[in-house]
């Protein structure tokens, strides 16, 4: 008799994706982050569902409903902080996952890579609308500032902003629709994840050597299920340490003040995971130019497969591009720091220089470095 997991129509899909999947034998722990993102997504959906049971998306009661969750609901504080800090863990895993893709040349699997970019943008949109829901000062002003950027679009900008707001300012209609978006988007993300995996399993995984690994594959279970389980335990440990010991360390104190349209906070800034993009936005004095730079800071990822001039897959044996890669990572950290600083000298100048470097490394320096490496190694085929 055939094993059920291999013959059953539904179990067969699960089996081919998580059990009998042929996997390169040498993939390192940097490949764990895909499964960790899956765990983050499931955690966020579950905690989010329980929060939605007690939350009210009305300007008069939103802030107090979050307070009620933390004070009166059984383990409400735990669910709320797991959800808030879970978002931070989600983005940490996301950044590492994308960083690994850039380092090891995974962008050459272009369908998987492009769906990944769509996933990244959708996750950013979800996190943004979610941050508005507690209806604190930073929620309100963050929503006002970021949605207002759309007014930079010529001709239709102002109409578009008012259409998104559902009125002439961020108000009850805005909060209600943002809650609706925040509820539906994770399920859209889940569907996109399945497409992401579908495309990945068409080609198979990349590996640290950058060489074809078809001759040396091992089953996903038990080898990588155990390896992923270690990652999951470490992730949950870090998350719970964050939640139980320093739950507010990544948040903004201003968000403990109820939203007040008549009082602007001294420094309006988004959550830490958006600061790099916010710094790029602020580094351009022109409104439309800033918005375009903001969008391009993410969409530039789509250029990686097109700008690849190297004859080798990944940066494992390419020291010059490796050096540029780590400068790029350091530059990203500088942008994150600048995004959280006030708009004054010297921060503006540092931000402008870091923004120029961000785009220059990807568009100019990396392709040139790859060509130099080809030349040194005489890879002219």
Curated annotation (Swiss-Prot):
It comes from Eligmodontia morgani. This is Cytochrome b. Keywords: Electron transport, Heme, Iron, Membrane, Metal-binding, Mitochondrion, Mitochondrion inner membrane, Respiratory chain, Transmembrane, Transmembrane helix, Transport, Ubiquinone. Signal peptide: none annotated. It is found in: Mitochondrion inner membrane. The cytochrome bc1 complex contains 11 subunits: 3 respiratory subunits (MT-CYB, CYC1 and UQCRFS1), 2 core proteins (UQCRC1 and UQCRC2) and 6 low-molecular weight proteins (UQCRH/QCR6, UQCRB/QCR7, UQCRQ/QCR8, UQCR10/QCR9, UQCR11/QCR10 and a cleavage product of UQCRFS1). This cytochrome bc1 complex then forms a dimer. PROSITE patterns: CYTB_CTER, CYTB_NTER. Heme 1 (or BL or b562) is low-potential and absorbs at about 562 nm, and heme 2 (or BH or b566) is high-potential and absorbs at about 566 nm. Heme b b562 binds at residues 83, 182. Binds 2 heme b groups non-covalently. CDD domains: cytochrome_b_C, Cytochrome_b_N. Its cofactor is heme b. The chain crosses the membrane at residues 33-53, 77-98, 113-133, 178-198, 226-246, 288-308, 320-340, 347-367. It is a multi-pass membrane protein. Belongs to the cytochrome b family. GO terms for biological process: mitochondrial electron transport, ubiquinol to cytochrome c. One of its GO terms (cellular component) is mitochondrial inner membrane. Its main location: mitochondrion. A ubiquinone binds at residue 201. One of its GO terms (molecular function) is metal ion binding. Heme b b566 binds at residues 97, 196. The keyword Ion transport does not apply. It comes from the Eukaryota. The keyword Zinc-finger does not apply. Component of the ubiquinol-cytochrome c reductase complex (complex III or cytochrome b-c1 complex) that is part of the mitochondrial respiratory chain. The b-c1 complex mediates electron transfer from ubiquinol to cytochrome c. Contributes to the generation of a proton gradient across the mitochondrial membrane that is then used for ATP synthesis.
């Amino acid at each position: 008799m055939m094993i059920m997991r291999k013959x059953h129509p539904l179990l067969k899909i699960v089996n081919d994706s998580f059990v009998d999947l042929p996997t390169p034998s040498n993939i390192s722990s940097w490949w764990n982050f895909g499964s960790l993102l899956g765990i983050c997504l499931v955690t966020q959906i579950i905690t989010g569902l329980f929060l939605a049971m007690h939350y009210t998306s009305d300007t008069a009661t939103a802030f107090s409903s979050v307070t009620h969750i933390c004070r009166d609901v059984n383990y409400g504080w735990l669910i709320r902080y797991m959800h808030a800090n879970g978002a931070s863990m989600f983005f940490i895993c996301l950044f590492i996952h994308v960083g690994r893709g850039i380092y090891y040349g995974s962008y050459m699997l272009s369908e998987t890579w492009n769906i990944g970019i769509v996933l990244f943008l959708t996750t950013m949109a979800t996190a943004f609308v979610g941050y508005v829901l507690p209806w604190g000062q930073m929620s309100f002003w963050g929503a006002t500032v970021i949605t207002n950027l759309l007014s930079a679009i010529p001709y239709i900008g102002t109409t578009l902003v008012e259409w998104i707001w559902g009125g002439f300012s961020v108000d009850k209609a805005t909060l209600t629709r943002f809650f609706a978006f925040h509820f539906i988007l994770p399920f859209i993300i889940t569907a996109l994840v399945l497409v992401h995996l579908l495309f990945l399993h068409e080609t198979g995984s990349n590996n640290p050597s950058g060489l074809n690994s078809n001759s040396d594959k091992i089953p996903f279970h038990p080898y990588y299920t155990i390896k992923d389980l270690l990652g999951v335990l470490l992730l949950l440990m870090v998350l719970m340490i964050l939640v139980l010991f320093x739950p507010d360390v990544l948040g903004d104190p201003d968000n403990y003040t109820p939203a007040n349209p008549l009082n602007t906070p001294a420094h309006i800034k988004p959550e830490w995971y958006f600061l790099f993009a916010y710094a790029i936005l602020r580094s351009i004095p022109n409104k439309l130019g800033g918005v375009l730079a903001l969008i391009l800071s993410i969409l530039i990822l789509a250029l990686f497969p097109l700008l690849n001039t190297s004859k080798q897959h990944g940066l494992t044996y390419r020291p010059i591009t490796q050096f540029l890669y780590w400068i790029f990572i350091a530059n990203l950290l500088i942008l994150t720091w600048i995004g959280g600083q006030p708009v004054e000298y010297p921060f503006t100048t540092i931000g402008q220089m870091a923004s120029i470097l961000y785009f220059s490394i990807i568009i100019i320096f990396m392709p040139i470095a790859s060509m130099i490496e080809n030349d040194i190694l005489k890879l002219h085929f």
